[in-house]
Structure formats: C-alpha cells, structure tokens
Design a protein with these regions (language model features):
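Residue register of alpha-helical TPR repeats
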Residues: 12, 52-53, 92, 132, ...
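Short, small-residue-biased leader/transition segments that mark boundaries at the very start
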Residues: 1-6
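Hydrophobic positions within repeat-based interaction scaffolds
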Residues: 190-259
C-alpha cells in the first residue's frame, strides 16, 4: 500500500503533469489528471496538494467559462489550504474566491472574504499578499463604481512597495479617469517615479489620459511610443532566441570535435 508521503509525491507529479497538458491546450487530459490526483490527495489527507489541484482545476474551468464549477473549486481550495495550515495560500485562495463571486454579482460575500484574507496578510507580514488583497478590494469597488473606496485600496496596495505596485498605479489612474478627475489624474502621473523598466506603463497612462480628455493628437503620440516600445521588445526577444540557438549549436559543435 502506498504511504502518505509517496501518495503526496504522486499527487504532486500528477499536478505538474496536468499543468503540462494545460500548456499544450489538452484540457480534457489535464482535467482527468487533476481529478485522479485530487482523489488520491484526499484519500491520503494530502491537503496542501489538494488545495493546489483545486486551484488549478478552477483555472481550467475558467478557460471554459464554467462559472459554477470554478466557484466550487475555489471554495474547495480555500478549505484544503486551511486544513493544511498553509495560511499564505489560504489567504490567496480567499482572495481568488472573492474575485470569483464578483462574476456572479455576489458582492455581499466578497468583502467578508477579503477582510479575512487581509487579516491573515497582516499576521504574516507579507507585503505582496497585502498588496494583492488591497488590489482585489480596489477592483471590486471599481466594479461597483465606488471610486473613493477603490482609490483608497489602490493607494494602500501602492504603499506596500510590492513588485507589482506599478500596476496598481495604472489601476488608480483608471479610477481617476472613470471618475472624471482628470486634473487629479495629471497630478498622479507627475508624482509617480519613472523607472526605465516600467516606462511603457507610464506612456500608456498618458495615452489613456489624453484620450479621455479628447486630446487625440497627444493620445496618438503616446500610443505610437507604446507601439515602438513593444516592437523593440519583440526585436530584443527574437535576437535573444537567435543567440541562444547559436550558443547551443556552438556547444554541440565543440562536443563533437572533442569526441
């Protein structure tokens, strides 16, 4: 009979195999692998692995727009992570569950879920988790057109200094534009520290702002900058791939010469 440890390992292997099928677009095979792995994980109380499997199954249902099943798997994932005492993943699962609820306009359940996730993030002192939960608050309040609340939480996400804070800066800009606070939008862009690695997002921000103001000439200018930056990025990526191929070829040639 398989031990609990070996069953946990088997479930993990199946989890990675399922993800590989998803990347290849073989969703039916992936779902079958996930279902078998989940059954194995539950039988041997491998709750942490079961949580991840449910989370990936929820993602897969999302690809197929099956909302009810996706919501159910988000609930299962959060319960399994709680049983496993993996509180970081539990908080993320609660956050994901809250976001799923918005798809069915179930806003009443979203705030309590996010409040619980936020409490956990404060106990764990995890700034990325805190920022993600604050971002979720912002997104949900934005969907309800409660722009003041959305602004407050996007600012909270930015203040954490997480690696994704620049995205929250863009989300906050969207709030100002939607709320017709265009002067504040200008002020916000000017106060943002401009780093080279996120220059694209700020040029995109100017494009969105000028478009909202009806200044289409200026908007077109910044849109063209964004297009040029994307073209340059594609060129660099292609050149990198060529260099990698050349390197592999040269290494293979050297090995042949030495044999």
């Amino acid at each position: 009979f398989p031990t609990r440890r070996s069953s946990d390992l088997q479930a993990q292997i199946a989890l990675y195999l399922g993800r590989a099928y998803v990347e290849d677009g073989e969703y039916d095979n992936a779902m079958q692998i996930y279902a078998d792995a989940l059954q194995l994980a539950k039988e041997h109380q491998a709750y942490n692995v079961a949580g991840y499997i449910c989370a990936y199954m929820a993602d897969l249902y999302g690809f197929r727009d099956i909302t009810s099943e996706r919501l159910e798997k988000r609930k299962e994932a959060s319960n399994f992570f709680k049983k496993a005492r993996n509180y970081k993943s539990y908080a993320y699962a609660l956050k994901d569950l809250a976001c799923e609820c918005t798809l069915t306009d179930s806003f009443n359940c979203t705030i309590p879920l996010l409040q619980k996730a936020d409490s956990i993030s404060q106990l764990l002192h995890n700034k990325d988790l805190t920022a993600d939960v604050a971002n979720a608050f912002g997104v949900i309040y934005e969907a309800q057109e409660k722009y003041k609340n959305a602004e407050r939480y996007f600012l909270k996400a930015i203040e954490t200094g997480s690696k994704e804070s620049y995205k929250d800066s863009i989300s906050l800009l969207h709030i100002y534009i939607k709320d017709n606070q265009l002067a504040k939008a200008h002020e916000w862009i000017e106060t943002i520290t401009k780093h080279n690695d996120i220059a694209y997002y700020f040029n995109q921000a100017y494009y969105l702002l000028y478009k909202a103001e009806g200044k289409y000439k200026e908007a077109l200018h910044y849109k063209e900058i964004c297009s040029d930056m994307l073209d340059s990025l594609t060129l660099v990526q292609n050149e990198t791939k060529v260099l990698e191929i050349e390197k592999k070829y040269n290494n293979a040639k050297i090995r042949e010469e030495n044999e």
